[in-house]
């Protein structure tokens, strides 16, 4: 049981708080495509929206002080005990409180790089030291390197799985071997913010390790697949003992009544989660096809964002995209990469057009001509009134490009003649 007398707050120094921020300095209200925060473009579940509206009328009443209503629902959802769950104001608060509970002056935290840096910065702000282990050549977290970095001062190993910004997973077999080698007294924090998006069978959540006695703290959020980033609800899953230590440094009433209601409703709407995952898969393919067409290499993604090499300095490309209304992220000592979140179908198509424009302006030209003929892109996609269709012809040959309606009736012939090798654009006016 939580003791009110144990609640405390630890404030980071100003510089530490800025360094720990997960956000960019883009204008949050001025965009054509906000592709920098890995948000859910479908928005919240309709059930969550209704719950928000209903609960707004009770905004004059304090919330459940200790978030036990949401903790009970999460525990039931994941087949855990309520004392194995700690809810807070987004994963942001949870990460801070994990650091506050287990890291003090002289302690060490080990994490991967590139990765999500908040836990490391919270540790530094608490007087600890962060040790960074580079990811391997396949952009995967180097678990053996992390084991080799352990010292007598190590208190937390912080993993992000799937990783952000590299969007790669830790193989489930590698994770099992890794956890068996963790010395006593070290906690393994695993941030699973993007857990629901993963499709590969090589991945497994670390939640089952909670009941197996491993010293793991799994961190999750309602900000991503549930579409509640603005509601600020996150949670930790661990043993009752470790959860108690996290709760002992947590302030009460940090999550509002409407946010409680939205999280509870969203948790029950599996259809919305399924729709979100399906839309993400489609729109991620749109990005992958577009990047390939532009001759850009990207890192295969298991999440709702992709890291792509733009073949030039990323900063000016991001600025050029921002001028066209598209917000993306740069950094992580990857000077030629931008991180792009999946958005709506229209946002993906418009973004690819903008990216091509910026790259052409920057003097980055693609000389890649796919060896397989066919339609490379359609903007917008799906189209209705007007669109641009781009095709590739690898050799001299006759090309026939005909549009049919959904009943199979021919509506328009765009081209029916020989074309030279290369890339060709056609505009259909929708008439």
List the predicted regions and their residue ranges.
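PLP-dependent aminotransferase class I/II
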Residues: 45, 215-299
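Conserved PLP-binding catalytic core of the aspartate aminotransferase-like
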Residues: 135-137, 281, 290-324, 342
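Phosphate-binding glycine-rich loop
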Residues: 67-108, 122, 126
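N-terminal export signals
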Residues: 1-18
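PLP-dependent aminotransferase-like
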Residues: 101-159
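Active-site pre-lysine segment of PLP-dependent enzymes
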Residues: 143-150, 165-188, 192-225
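N-terminal "arm"/small-domain region of PLP-dependent enzymes with the aminotransferase-like
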Residues: 16-61
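C-terminal outer-membrane/trafficking sorting elements
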Residues: 367-379, 383-431
């Amino acid at each position: 049981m939580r003791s009110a007398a144990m609640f405390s707050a630890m404030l980071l120094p100003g510089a530490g708080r800025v360094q720990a921020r997960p956000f960019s300095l883009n204008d949050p209200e001025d965009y054509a495509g906000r592709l920098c925060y890995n948000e859910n473009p479908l928005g919240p579940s309709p059930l969550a929206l209704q719950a928000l509206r209903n609960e707004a009328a009770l905004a004059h009443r304090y919330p459940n002080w200790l978030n036990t209503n949401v903790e009970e629902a999460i525990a039931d959802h994941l087949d855990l005990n309520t004392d194995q769950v700690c809810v807070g104001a987004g994963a942001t608060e949870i990460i801070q409180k994990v650091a506050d509970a287990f890291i003090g002056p002289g302690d060490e935290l080990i994490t991967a790089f590139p990765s999500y840096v908040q836990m490391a910065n919270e540790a530094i702000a608490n007087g600890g030291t962060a040790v960074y282990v580079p990811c391997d050549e396949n952009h995967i977290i180097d678990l053996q390197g992390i084991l080799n970095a352990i010292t007598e001062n190590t208190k937390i190993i912080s993993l992000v799985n799937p990783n952000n910004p590299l969007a790669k997973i830790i193989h489930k077999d590698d994770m099992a071997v890794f956890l068996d080698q963790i010395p006593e007294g070290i906690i393994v924090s695993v941030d699973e913010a993007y857990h629901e998006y993963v499709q590969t069978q090589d991945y497994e959540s670390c939640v089952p390790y909670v009941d197996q006695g491993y010293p793991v703290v799994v961190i999750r959020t309602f900000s991503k697949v549930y579409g509640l980033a603005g509601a600020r609800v996150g949670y930790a899953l661990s043993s009752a003992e470790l959860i108690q230590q996290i709760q002992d440094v947590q302030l009460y009433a940090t999550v509002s009544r409407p946010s409680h209601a939205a999280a509870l409703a969203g948790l029950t709407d599996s259809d919305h989660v399924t729709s979100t995952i399906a839309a993400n898969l489609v729109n991620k393919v749109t990005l992958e096809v577009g990047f390939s067409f532009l001759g850009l290499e990207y890192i295969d993604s298991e999440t709702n964002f992709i890291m792509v090499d733009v073949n030039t300095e990323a900063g000016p490309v991001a600025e050029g995209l921002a001028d066209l209304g598209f917000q993306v992220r740069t950094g992580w000592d990857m000077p030629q990469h931008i991180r792009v979140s999946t958005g709506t179908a229209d946002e993906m198509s418009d973004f690819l057009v903008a990216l091509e424009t910026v790259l052409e302006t920057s003097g980055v030209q693609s000389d890649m001509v796919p060896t397989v003929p066919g339609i490379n892109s359609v903007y917008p996609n799906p189209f209705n009134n007007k669109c641009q269709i781009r095709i590739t012809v690898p050799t001299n040959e006759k090309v026939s490009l005909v549009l049919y309606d959904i009943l199979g009736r021919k509506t328009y012939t765009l081209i029916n003649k020989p074309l030279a090798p290369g890339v060709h654009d056609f505009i259909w006016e929708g008439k």
